[in-house]
C-alpha cells in the first residue's frame, strides 16, 4: 500500500491534469455552502424581530467559549456540512445591529475593561491607558449621531465608520485607538459616513462581487 508521501506525486500530477475541473468543483461546492448559509439566515432577528437580507444577519454564538470557528469567514465555505450544522446549533441568528449590542453587553458583563485589554508592565502603562481612553471617548462622541442611511438613532457601539471611497482608506477607524492621535483619527473619520451596523453591512455587500465572502 502506498503511504502518504508516495501518494503526493500522484496527487500533484492529477491536479495539474485536471486543474480547471478541480477549480470548478470547488467553486460549485462553495456556492452551494454560501446558499445554504444564506437560506438559514432568511428569518427574523431573534432579538428585534426585524426582517433583513441574509447578509445583514449573523450567527451569534450563545457561549463564546464553545465557538470552534467563525461562520462568516471565507474559509468556512469548504467546511463539511456536518461541521457547519454542529457550529450553527450553538448560535442565535440576529441582525448586525443586535449582534453589536450583544457583543458590547458581553464585554460589560465580563468586566472586559480597558485595564483588561491594556495589560502591561510598562512604567507608562497608566499614561497609555489614559491616551487610549481619550480616543475611545472621542470615537463614541463622533458616533452620537443618527445613522446616515436609515435616519435612526442607536447606541454609539452600533454605529460604524464606512469609508465613502475604499481606495482612500488608510486605517480601520475602530482600530486606531492605540496607535493614532486625535488629528490622525479625525482625518480618517472625515473620509467616512457614520452608519449603523445593518446599513454598513448592506453597503459592503453591494460593493462586493457576488462571489466575495460568506456575506
Model regions and ranges:
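BZIP DNA-binding basic region
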Residues: 1-27, 54-58, 63-70, 97-131, ...
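Short Cys/His-centered divalent metal-binding micro-motifs
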Residues: 91-111, 192-211
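Short beta-strand-alpha-helix junction that forms the catalytic/metal-binding core
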Residues: 68-98, 170-199
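Short cysteine-rich loop/turn motifs with clustered Cys
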Residues: 32-64, 89-98, 134-166, 190-199
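Short intrinsically disordered terminal tails
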Residues: 1, 212-215
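Residues in and immediately flanking transmembrane alpha helices
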Residues: 74, 110-112, 176, 213
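Short, intrinsically disordered, charge-biased short linear motifs at domain edges
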Residues: 29-37, 78-86, 131-140, 179-187
Amino acid at each position: 500500500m502506498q503511504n502518504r508521501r508516495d501518494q503526493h506525486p500522484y496527487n500533484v500530477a492529477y491536479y495539474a491534469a485536471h486543474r480547471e475541473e478541480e477549480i470548478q468543483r470547488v467553486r460549485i461546492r462553495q456556492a452551494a455552502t454560501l446558499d445554504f448559509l444564506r437560506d438559514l439566515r432568511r428569518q427574523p432577528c431573534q432579538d428585534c424581530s426585524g426582517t433583513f437580507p441574509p447578509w445583514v444577519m449573523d450567527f451569534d454564538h450563545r457561549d463564546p467559549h464553545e465557538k470552534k470557528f467563525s461562520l462568516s469567514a471565507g474559509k468556512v465555505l469548504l467546511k463539511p456540512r456536518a461541521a457547519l450544522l454542529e457550529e450553527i446549533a450553538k448560535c442565535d441568528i440576529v441582525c448586525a445591529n443586535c449582534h453589536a449590542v450583544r457583543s458590547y453587553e458581553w464585554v460589560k458583563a465580563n468586566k472586559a475593561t480597558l485595564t483588561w485589554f491594556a495589560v502591561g508592565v510598562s512604567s507608562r502603562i497608566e499614561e497609555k491607558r489614559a491616551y487610549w481612553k481619550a480616543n475611545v471617548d472621542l470615537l463614541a462622541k463622533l458616533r452620537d449621531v443618527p445613522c446616515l442611511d436609515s435616519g435612526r438613532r442607536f447606541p454609539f457601539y452600533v454605529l460604524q465608520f464606512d469609508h465613502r471611497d475604499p481606495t482612500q482608506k488608510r486605517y480601520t477607524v475602530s482600530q486606531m485607538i492605540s496607535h493614532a492621535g486625535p488629528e490622525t483619527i479625525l482625518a480618517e473619520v472625515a473620509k467616512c459616513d457614520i452608519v449603523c451596523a445593518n446599513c454598513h453591512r448592506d453597503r459592503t455587500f453591494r460593493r462586493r462581487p457576488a462571489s466575495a465572502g460568506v456575506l
